Amino acid sequence: MGIKIQEYHKEYLKKSWNGDTPFDVDVKMFQLDAVNTSYVFGVIDDGYLVHGYFGKKICGDDLTYLLRLEENPWVPKTNMRDKGTFMDSAAFEYPCHGTGDYREPCLMVMDDEGMTTTDLRYQSHKVYKGKPALEGLPATFANENEAETLEITCIDKHTGLEAVLVYTVFNDLDVITRSVRLKNTGKAPLNVKRVLSMCVDFDNDGYDLITLNGSWARERVIERSKLHHGKQGIDSVKGESSHQNNPFIALVSHNADEDCGEAYGFNFVYSGNFFAQAEVTQHKYTRAVMGINHFDFNWLLEAGEEFVAPEVVMVYSDEGIGKMSRTFHDLYRQHLIRGEYKDKRRPILINNWEATYFNFDTDKLIGIAKEASKLGIEMLVMDDGWFGHRDSDNSSLGDWFVYEKKLNGGLKYLVDEVNKLGMKFGIWFEPEMISPDSELYRKHPEWAIQVRGRELTMSREQYVLDYSNKEVRDYVYGMMKAVLDSANIEYIKWDMNRQLTEVGSTSLPKNRQRELWHRYVLGVYDLMNRLTTDYPHILLENCSGGGARFDAGMLYYSPQIWCSDDTDAIERLKIQHGTSICYP
């Protein structure tokens, strides 16, 4: 297990109309070995990273034969030395836009002259024990005894764009993770138009594509279809991972079932707009890619600035889909979920929402708690309606102070009475939202996500707060902290009940407006991280209109996620089954 690096001088044949002629290539090979998995790629002497193999563990001193270095007279090549680097057929490790690879690229960057050609070449590499954290992002973690990491640094000499490809192989699991770090080492600004986190080129198309699709109350239903020529994929453009598509795909052999066959699983550790696709080419090769959705995306990199792309988890199994699922489960339990509740039994809780909706007061909640305690239920969660003047869903989001008309005696009195019954107490927040009818909106209408001069689209009688703005996050955190410090609260249900529209920010300059999609997600992560750091004993459960944000990014902050608003026993079987294909 671990990372192996070797160098070779090889001779290949150039195919042409006049017969085959030999050509020489210097090759640097990288082999990443997990328990039963090998991942192999190489650097040829013009600096391109060429993928070789991903699958069942292999041995051998010289694996250069795995690299697909083919000449094809109908497609562009990058030099006049006939070295076989034909762009549209090579299996690239991290393909770029503009130099003749017409398949789906991972990277497209516009320079200060408006040109979008990007040409990354190998510059250096380093290997070290352990796994680095990703600044501002959720990611799997490992100490020096649990994993080994390879960083490949590539450079576009024309623009000064540096890309660091980060690979981590885990010692005890068939898992390899990938992420990308960009840096503008030049003098002129660059605009990142597309930055995916992962590409794997397969040398055949003999797979089925598995996705997790659905809708509200029907999340993550398994869909399986045979690959065909062209592009098949899923995405989200809603500002969250969504009810409709989950940031997970798998490529499995046609005969794969729970116990037999090959399965390649890919999961994006991210909670915003994503893009995942499998593309079958004219040669019946397959390219799988995954990362941040490039739709309506742009990120300005001034000189010296960096951008960190989220992580993709790659899992291989030659023992069917079931082994792939169990590997994801083991990884996330051991190396993603954190905090006191990582391995701790979660309390059995009762939530008042379906029983009362907005029509409750202190006495009614205590009555529910008394009956629940007789049944052995361990926690009462007070849901929507306890704050501002919230008697319906058309007011008070953002006003996170106690509605004393309902909670006569105050929050601490209610919590103390519930605690006397031997029960814990939890509370509902929707921290990302703001109601037009709220003290906060009347004071700070500019804090809503908006396009100046355009009417805002209403959804569930609410707008979305601009979490790219630190002032907004600080205010919301201060309000939540005051509530949490006022009583013995041991659980938070964090809800999100609408998606993003009119995506603009009053706090960002014109040339950074398209960054809002991603900056919003980073802001959510920032606030969740502050909560879990300052209140480590509180169990944070994520919810989004049911299961619209059930993803690995959320698992990093909330060890418990509401799976769906559909709790019908039969319907829930499909939802639980689909969810369990990737998530524990």
Regions found by a protein language model. Name each.
Residues 388-441, 529-533, 537:
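Acidic/aromatic-lined carbohydrate-recognition and catalytic surfaces
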Residues 435-474, 518-584:
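Glycan-recognition surfaces
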Residues 346-352, 378, 382, 425-429, ...:
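Hydrophobic faces of well-ordered beta-strands that scaffold small-molecule active sites
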Residues 345-347, 354-358, 401-404, 424, ...:
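Active-site-adjacent "subsite" loops/lids of carbohydrate-active enzymes
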Residues 36, 180, 304, 350, ...:
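Conserved, mostly hydrophobic/aromatic
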Residues 364-387:
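Catalytic domains of carbohydrate-active enzymes, especially glycoside hydrolases
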Residues 371, 375-377, 465-495, 523, ...:
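An active-site-proximal structural segment forming one wall of the substrate-binding cleft
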Residues 5-13, 23-39, 49-279, 295-297:
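Polysaccharide-binding surfaces and accessory modules of carbohydrate-active proteins
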